[in-house]
Amino acid sequence: MKHAFLAFIAFAFCHILYAQPKVPNQPATDPANAEAPFMKFPTIPPFHLLGLDSSTYLTPADLKKGRKTIVMFFSPDCEHCKHQTEAILADFNDFKDMNIVMATYQPFSDMKEFNEHYKMTEHSNVKIGRDEKFVLPPFYKIHSLPYLALYDKKGNLITTFEGTQKTEVILNAFNGNGTASH
């Protein structure tokens, strides 16, 4: 009887585990995103991120004009976010002329430690900030991290990605190849 009960518990656990929905990559063209605010306002959102110095705020006005932009929502303890950051750093030459905005809602100390480890802000085109008011996740309807939103030189949405992406996929989307929506 004891073994039957344990087998039932194991079966129930596995059934519950595999019954969880998998969140696929949902680019901007996905119908599931039709009602998301970023689809109604497909330009760089009016973010207000607490900077690494803990006293200034990063807004879209701080971005260099006429550049492609990546808005990446991440968590400092997310392994996929770390892999995405490492991939961008490995091919950084391809990203050096873009604005890269990295936003998190996690504690300020974790964000600062993440930057100290990856040294992202040693690159003048990379800005990291804390989304204290939790504006970006509902704006983009974020389900999984990292979340990337790509914008053209005029600040218009190209596409979005959830989960780690190869740098070629990101660059192809910017160049109009692959999964870009515009």
What do these predicted regions represent?
Residues 118-149:
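Short, internal strand/loop/helix patches
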Residues 59-82, 88:
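Short active-site neighborhood of thiol/selenol oxidoreductases, capturing the structured segment around
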Residues 22-61:
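N-terminal "domain-start" segment that seeds a small globular fold
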Residues 1-25, 177-182:
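Bacterial Sec-dependent N-terminal signal peptides
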Residues 44-45, 68-69, 145-146:
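Short loop/turn microsegments at loop-to-beta-strand junctions
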Residues 144, 150-182:
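Thiol-/selenol-based redox modules, centered on thioredoxin-like
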